[in-house]
Amino acid sequence: MLAKLLCHKFFQKSLTHLHKARTKTLLDCGDALIHGNKLTLTSIGRHLHGSAHVKHKIKRVDRFLKNKYLYQEQVEIYKAIIQPIIANLSYLAIAIDWSGCCTHKYHLLRASLLVDGRSITIFNMVVEQNDLESRDKHSLFLKQLNQIIGEHQRIYIVTDGGFLTPWYSEVISLGWHVVGRVRGTMKCYIEKKGQWKTLKELHVEASTTPATLGKARLTQHSPTACDAYLHLYHGEAKGRKGKSRFTKDTKMYQNLAKEPWVLSSTDEMLNSEQVVKIYMKRTQIEQNFRDDKSQRYGFSWRFSQSNTVERISILCLIAFVGSMALWFI
């Protein structure tokens, strides 16, 4: 009870400039989510505190999910809660990745702060299937993320191989650094060697000791080509031979795990060991997604039948508040 009281005091202090009734309902829904453990309209309504009949509680949550003012100020809510946490950090390592969301019609783009243990969600953006990985949504996401975290001494955006040079260019334009994995058929111009190399050719040079290739030009013909510093690393086998949880039809996942890392960093001050250490933490965002989706240990995200971007976005906001409360505890 004391931990819950302290969490509420933190949230109320952070959200003092926002609408009091909406703030109260948001915190009440966060509590209900923690007790009910299902990110659905009916479960949250059933576990709301108070003497009202269950049907009225569910209607209250329904009205909350379609509140257009709350949807418009969600960036301000993320900012108000996150700012006190990141204010005194010397640098920010932020993992960004896509995930499926409730149904196959919607997807989530999430930014998570990489720390010791579980990462902390900073911002969620829900989009429809047609906008998955679109450049416009990437630009909007980075713009809103910039509003949330504000000015900071050093910011590293950590991404996997699905984010290509257009993304790098967007991040660099904000004055941030990228730490990411380079994959696919891309060619890189290695300044030290004075020649273009395919990633497969670079894989041969990788070992269990992180090594740098120096400055390189990413992509040969793309208009968004950019410069970065490349690092090689091939981790030791995990000793799971013959115990894969994947079927023979999904060899792709096994090959991805065995493939050496070609990591890129736009910060020349980072050495290979530091780049590998930062990138290794990227898997924390996958744990973040599992915390929301797991039907046994998480918020059972898949049970939600909400079917608009606005309603799902507010459900994600409720999950964010619930996760933050559990993280504090």
Predicted regions and their residues:
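Short N-terminal secondary-structure initiator segments
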Residues: G50-Q74, Y233-R245
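Single, function-defining residue in the core of a domain
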Residues: M1-K38, I77, L89-L92, V115-I329
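Short secondary-structure boundary/capping segments within folded domains
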Residues: L33-G36, S51-H53, Q83-I86, G100-C101, ...
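Active-site-proximal, Lys/Arg-enriched surface segment
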Residues: I58-D116
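A structured, charge-rich N-terminal accessory region that forms the first stable segment of a protein
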Residues: R22-K59, R63-L65
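Short secondary-structure transition/capping motifs
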Residues: L33, G50, N67-Y71, G100, ...
